[in-house]
From Swiss-Prot:
Residues 116-188 form the Death domain. Adapter protein that associates with PIDD1 and the caspase CASP2 to form the PIDDosome, a complex that activates CASP2 and triggers apoptosis. Also recruits CASP2 to the TNFR-1 signaling complex through its interaction with RIPK1 and TRADD and may play a role in the tumor necrosis factor-mediated signaling pathway. InterPro entries: CARD, CARD_RAIDD, CRADD, CRADD_Death, DEATH-like_dom_sf, Death_dom. It comes from the Eukaryota. GO terms for biological process: apoptotic signaling pathway; cellular response to mechanical stimulus; DNA damage response; DNA damage response, signal transduction by p53 class mediator; positive regulation of apoptotic process; positive regulation of apoptotic signaling pathway. It comes from Mus musculus (Mouse). Keywords: Apoptosis, Cytoplasm, Nucleus. Transmembrane segments: none annotated. This is Death domain-containing protein CRADD. Its main location: cytoplasm. GO terms for molecular function: death domain binding; protease binding; protein-macromolecule adaptor activity. Pfam families: CARD (PF00619), Death (PF00531). The gene is Cradd.
Length: 199
């Protein structure tokens, strides 16, 4: 779930709790769409009050993947006024958030860690032609880029993966998410690229 959507759920937590959202079809819909597991449903239903049930649902949702917030909105068919409130809050948060602000919500130990192979692979899938200026801003040379291209002449994805793996090997502990964020900012690449890697 995106940082902005987590913020919306946090800011409306008490209001949502007061609506006792778990009594209708909400849980069933979230289960059907694969957002909640059977264990989640049992855990929520075991709570003694409607407020506690809703609060537990709100605690679980942020960790249930990128589609959780939109699926939650879809589940609120019986509560159109709640859905409207959430959509409005989301628009306001989006308007307020400068692109780099979601970084503030990421723990420092993650920012100072290096991306895994899987995360580099994810980034390579999303990065377009701007990958070359990004790796140059991270400290690789034109020669490095040339080698990556020579090693994988017909596969841009593999060129990008190799370039970031070289960056990680060469810079060791300095090859962090934070330096990657700065590299993306330096070439004005889409900052949400990093967000997707960390979800």
């Amino acid at each position: 779930m995106e940082a902005r959507d987590k913020q919306v759920l946090r800011s409306l937590r008490l209001e949502l709790g007061a609506e006792v959202l778990v009594e209708g079809l909400v849980l069933q819909y979230l289960y059907q769409e694969g957002i909640l597991t059977e264990n989640h449903i049992q855990e929520i239903k075991a709570q003694t009050t409607g407020l506690r049930k809703t609060m537990l649902l709100l605690d679980i949702l942020p960790s249930r993947g990128p589609k959780a917030f939109d699926t939650f909105l879809d589940s609120l068919q019986e509560f159109p006024w709640v859905r409207e409130k959430l959509e409005k809050a989301r628009e306001e948060v989006t308007a307020e958030l400068p692109t780099g602000d979601w970084m503030a919500g990421i723990p420092s130990h993650i920012l100072s860690s290096s991306p895994s192979d899987q995360q580099i692979n994810q980034l390579a899938q999303r990065l377009g032609p701007e990958w070359e200026p990004v790796v140059l801003s991270l400290g690789l040379s034109q020669t490095d880029i040339y080698r990556c291209k020579a090693n994988h002449p017909h596969n841009v994805h593999s060129q990008v993966v190799e370039a970031f793996v070289r960056w990680r090997q060469r810079f060791g502990k300095q090859a962090t998410f934070l330096s990657l964020h700065k590299g993306l900012q330096a070439v004005e690449a889409d900052p949400s690229l990093l967000q997707h890697m960390l979800e």
